[in-house]
Amino acid sequence: MKGLALCLVLSMATTMAFAAGGAEAAPASPAKSWDFAKETPLADVRIRQALAYAIDMKTITETLFEGLASPARSMTNVGAWQSPKLTEYAYNPQKAKELLAAVQWPADYVLDVVTYYADQQTADFLTTVQDYLSKVGVQMKWRLLEGDLAAQLWVAPADMVNGPSVVKWDLAYAAVAASAESEFYVRYGSTAPNNSHTPKDEVMDKLLEGLNVVDVNTQIKAMHAVQERLNEKLYSIPLYHQIAFIYVGNLLDIKGTVHGNDQFSYEKNILNWEIKRADGTMYTNTGPKEFWEAPITNPGLYAYQEYLFDKLINADASLTPTTGMLAKSYTVSPDGLKFVFDLKTDVKWHDGKPFTAEDVKFTIEFMARTNSFAAVNYKSIVGAEDYVAKKADGISGIVIDGNKVTVTFAKVNPNASLVFSQWPMLPRHLLKDSDPMTTQTDQFWQKPIGTGPFKAGEFVRNNYAVLERFDGYYRKGTGNIQKIFMSASGDNDPNLMVNAEAGKIDYAWSKSTADAKAIGKLPNFTVTKAPIRYTRFFHINQFPHMPNVK
């Protein structure tokens, strides 16, 4: 905590030093009457550019994040997949003031900034941004969202051209943990079910279509074009790229498991892990808070999502799809349009019911009607668009023949294998009457049932939850873990250091640089840096909406 406080002081001091050179007040905005029911200043690209110019991300990453994050020019990190033609919106408060004056920014408007991160580093970051914006004449207040986040953040307007907005915020401090590069960008399409922020852009829609190719070089060129459009229009403000940290205590033997991106599911062989505790309990973080989050927006962010639910296909530490999981085997046609899954016949749900091909068909159809990256990909299946539009009773491109399920895509989807390895199967017999758009409120998610190696046990809201080894699992393993005790947290765990010192962490992960430094000093932990495809940014709500802060 002291380190974070010091970083914040340094950041604030740097801010004031920069501001001192041009200390004149921002030019007074000429009076303009804004009809917020029909327009928002945030729809003007100059306002979005001004906000970007006003924030010194170089200083913030060097101080607050202690050099363990890097300023972002796009959602994609530096490398072959990032376009070399992108404009860098480097810190320039005078430019920000000029742009705000040109658009007649309403000086009494207070930006309503929301986030779902409850850790101290987020509070420090947003307080620092608040200070930067005030230097150019922009007021801002931020607040923490709780409860059903998808309903508060990612509901698209009925009219993607004119709005109005469904969500109630100006800026959302959020992140994308992308399983594939395209996952960063599909949310800007006018048909994306989670596009709550960016009005229809026909040019962007066409560029996004260009990502649906298999050849890597062609896909990279298409990705560059999408990035350049987003960089020009600045529909969101990329802030910084982060790495993750994985912590393993000395009581746990993970038997050579290769660390990967713990924001997603990959083969950890947890059934072979051994814990030096007589009761076989392993302690970890990322447990449920108010409820067990449905694996829709985040299919593997929380520990329980990976251990409660299995997928059709397995993946290795690099998230490359490998062998079958719930599928005994699978094949892909040479043109990449047809997947055939030969399902295992000895799989049971945690309530003892058999897992069947009907569960596979149900899950894909269920997910196609959600606000998720999976839905965007499933809509490429033959007949999916008619099903989502309620013009058909099912997706015609999904065909069941005994224990075999054939899924036929209407067009090449380079992310299909990835989606099948990340989004789990769900029980038809328990969720068939649940509305996909509001499923998080279903009683099922108070104690979910999956096909994974562990089943849901005791749950104390905003405190902890317990997973118990499932005796009916189709694989056995050689390890001795009988229970997993999960402290309630997101991917930035405010109690991680406290729990580590108290002996209540054996395996955990987070993105907090402060935690990484502190836990790294403990003699009984190994800390591993894990490169991840992860970018924090500000989503900007460009649909008409009334001011939330009065």
Predicted regions and their residues:
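A bilobed periplasmic-binding-protein/Venus flytrap-type ligand-binding module shared by bacterial periplasmic
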Residues: S29-I47, T63, L207, Q242, ...
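Aromatic- and charge-enriched surface segment that lines or borders ligand/interaction sites
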Residues: P41-A43, K328-A374, T406, N499-A502
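Detector for C-terminal structural segments
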Residues: A50-P84, Q121-D131, A158-P288, A303-Y304, ...
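N-terminal lobe/hinge region of extracytoplasmic solute-binding protein
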Residues: T284-V332, E365, I449
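Structural transition elements
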Residues: K38, A43-V45, Y53, S70-A102, ...
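A structural "hinge/loop" feature
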Residues: D35, T40, Y247-S265, T286-E306, ...
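Ligand-site clamp/hinge motif
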Residues: A26, Q139, D442-W445, G472-A518, ...
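Surface-exposed binding/hinge segments that line
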Residues: N377-D433
